[in-house]
């Protein structure tokens, strides 16, 4: 179990919260998180790269010149991979890059990654609830009050962020917003700081704390 200090929108201490998630064994934790990140990155690939082989490129199979008497290497087709406009040897073809990983392993990797970043986690009560119109400066100032730089890689985790909050955050290149029930290992490990709403922390405990 990890205890966290809860801060309000002004950056002042407003209580305490706890997070109790079951993590993987130390001997296998690093490998588990590594496989989860590899799987996530592999699944983001479209796998649509495609090249034409000598049987698919445009043009006939005409023999460019006679077999003997030219002094040149023999050629059997104008579409051989050795000639301009010919086919590609061992080029990419559409394929799936998906990697298999058990559901229990995926959830364990996510819980382990989250608990590993507990020192970089900032819990905020009522994050931007007073924000009615998009104001990026308000988000920057609030992060500053929480001792979090808006120019560093920040992951903000909320339950149901309003449209004003979404539009305020999307102007910040290094700040990413994600829902509490849609966490992923890559974002948790990639960010320098995790800013979590108090209700989002409770949602995380509810969704991922049942194993």
Curated annotation (Swiss-Prot):
Residues 41-54 have a biased composition (Polar residues). Coiled coil: none annotated. GO terms for molecular function: rRNA binding; structural constituent of ribosome. Residues 60-71 have a biased composition (Basic residues). One of its GO terms (cellular component) is ribosome. Keywords: Ribonucleoprotein, Ribosomal protein, RNA-binding, rRNA-binding. InterPro entries: Ribosomal_uL4 (IPR002136), Ribosomal_uL4-like (IPR013005), Ribosomal_uL4_dom_sf (IPR023574). The keyword Ribonucleoprotein applies. Pfam families: Ribosomal_L4. One of its GO terms (biological process) is translation. Residues 40-85 are annotated as: Disordered. PANTHER family: 50S RIBOSOMAL PROTEIN L4 (PTHR10746), LARGE RIBOSOMAL SUBUNIT PROTEIN UL4C (PTHR10746:SF17). One of the primary rRNA binding proteins, this protein initially binds near the 5'-end of the 23S rRNA. It is important during the early stages of 50S assembly. It makes multiple contacts with different domains of the 23S rRNA in the assembled 50S subunit and ribosome. Part of the 50S ribosomal subunit. NCBIfam families: rplD_bact. Belongs to the universal ribosomal protein uL4 family. This is Large ribosomal subunit protein uL4. It comes from Synechococcus sp. (strain CC9311).
